[in-house]
UniProtKB/Swiss-Prot annotation:
Gene field: GATA4
Name of the protein described by the UniProt record: Transcription factor GATA-4
Lineage: Eukaryota, Metazoa, Chordata, Craniata, Vertebrata
ZnF GATA-type: positions: 217-241, 271-295
Any GO BP annotation: cellular response to glucose stimulus
Compositionally skewed regions (Basic residues) per UniProt: 317-326
A GO MF label: co-SMAD binding
């Protein structure tokens, strides 16, 4: 039954690594010699007692290990001068010397006195005598094997030569921490850098809980917003109200600004000046009242309100001139009202000759007031040469043959109208008659 345990015992820790606290560890009865279980000695080696950092806690550790084991016959069969307890209790040795271990850990305590070491040795001897006198047999050996191997399995995971002492101390610390606080709530765990207080929440996380619960803006009553904000009192604001409050320091006004009305929404709109309801463009005056385009533009240009007498029922549009007006206009033949009837046959022949060439002549438009600037002496009279026309024949240009410049002015019996020159004679383009100021085109 204990063959597997016996094989594990051969590879276990050295005898000094076991603790002498188990009641079955000190049972050496009749069946103990035949049992394959190894029972270590509970005596503390002299090398251990000579260590300075264990002198103050040696007795406390030994007695504490006895109390940390099973509460069997060894606990009831302890010596008369030994009091079992935890490392934090005061113990009395066989010689009556009082010993009070440190409250935290015997390993890090100050070196003890010589009396405390003697008390520890006496307590160990008393426990050994009690264990040998408690009797036993095969059952006691089996119990010792179970207890010893159970403790060996627990202590074998440590690399320190005395793990059982510190294990009991650590167990007492864990029990004290569990009694004082809840599980996983010790100050050691809270001191870790990776662990934060769950109650402390980042303030910016509130802005990301948009859809976690039904929120409403306390200013405008909005239920949804891209970003929830808070005012100075902690109330929720939508992004628009919160940003407005942050920039201006006041609450965002609930009245929305009036949007520009479309044509369908301007049915009941009328001009504040002329009370018209139809206009191409609505304007506003200095007081902010709507005015029509005519009244608004008149006020802008003249600085005074538009008179009501200028009001028209229809909308006056701009009269634009066609761009191809000069191209479409063709010079027509001169009418009879513009030319005077000739007084002689020579003038009639010349008028007929010049009429045929009127398509090549351009009419000159002048103002009537220009006639006063030209006197009788400065006027250039032109005569017609009939012989020139008859001598040269039709081969000569009719305009050149019909005009003959005379350097001296003379009084003609018949008042002849001045003739317009050809395109080559630009200096003779303006000639005015004495009788009237109209432009005559031959």
């Amino acid at each position: 039954m204990y063959q597997s345990l016996a094989m594990a015992a051969n590879h276990g820790p050295p005898p000094g690594a076991y603790e002498a606290g188990g009641p079955g560890a000190f049972m050496h009865g009749a069946g103990a010699a035949s049992s394959p279980v190894y029972v270590p000695t509970p005596r503390v080696p002299s090398s251990v007692l000579g260590l300075s950092y264990l002198q103050g806690g040696g007795a406390g550790s030994a007695s504490g290990g006895a109390s940390g084991g099973s509460s069997g016959g060894a606990a009831s069969g302890a010596g008369p001068g030994t009091q079992q307890g935890s490392p934090g209790w005061s113990q009395a040795g066989a010689d009556g010397a009082a010993y009070t271990p440190p409250p935290v850990s015997p390993r890090f305590s100050f070196p003890g006195t010589t009396g405390s070491l003697a008390a520890a040795a006496a307590a160990a001897a008393a426990r050994e005598a009690a264990a040998y006198s408690s009797g036993g047999g095969a059952a006691g050996a089996g119990l010792a094997g179970r207890e010893q191997y159970g403790r060996a399995g627990f202590a074998g995971s440590y690399s320190s030569p005395y793990p059982a002492y510190m294990a009991d101390v650590g167990a007492s610390w864990a029990a004290a921490a569990a009694a004082s606080a809840g599980p996983f709530d010790s100050p050691v765990l809270h001191s870790l850098p990776g662990r934060a207080n769950p109650a402390a929440r980042h303030p910016n996380l509130d802005m990301f809980d948009d859809f976690s619960e039904g929120r409403e803006c306390v200013n405008c009553g909005a239920m949804s917003t891209p970003l929830w904000r808070r005012d100075g009192t902690g109330h929720y604001l939508c992004n628009a109200c919160g940003l407005y409050h942050k920039m201006n320091g006041i609450n965002r006004p609930l009245i929305k600004p009036q949007r520009r009305l479309s044509a369908s929404r301007r049915v009941g709109l009328s001009c504040a000046n002329c009370q018209t309801t139809t206009t191409t463009l609505w304007r506003r005056n200095a007081e902010g009242e709507p005015v029509c385009n005519a009244c608004g533009l008149y006020m802008k240009l003249h600085g005074v309100p538009r008179p009501l007498a200028m009001r028209k029922e229809g909308i006056q549009t701009r009269k634009r001139k066609p761009k191809n007006l000069n191209k479409s206009k063709t010079p027509a033949a001169p009418s009879g009202s513009e030319s005077l009837p000739p007084a002689s046959g020579a003038s009639s022949n010349s008028s007929n000759a010049t009429t045929s060439s009127s398509e090549e002549m351009r009419p000159i438009k002048t103002e009537p007031g220009l006639s006063s600037h030209y006197g009788h002496s400065s006027s250039v009279s032109q005569t017609f040469s009939v012989s020139a026309m008859s001598g040269h024949g039709p081969s000569i240009h009719p305009v050149l043959s019909a005009l003959k410049l005379s350097p001296q002015g003379y009084a003609s019996p018949v008042s002849q109208s001045p003739q317009t020159s050809s395109k080559q004679d630009s200096w003779n383009s303006l000639v005015l008659a004495d009788s009237h100021g109209d432009i005559i085109t031959a």
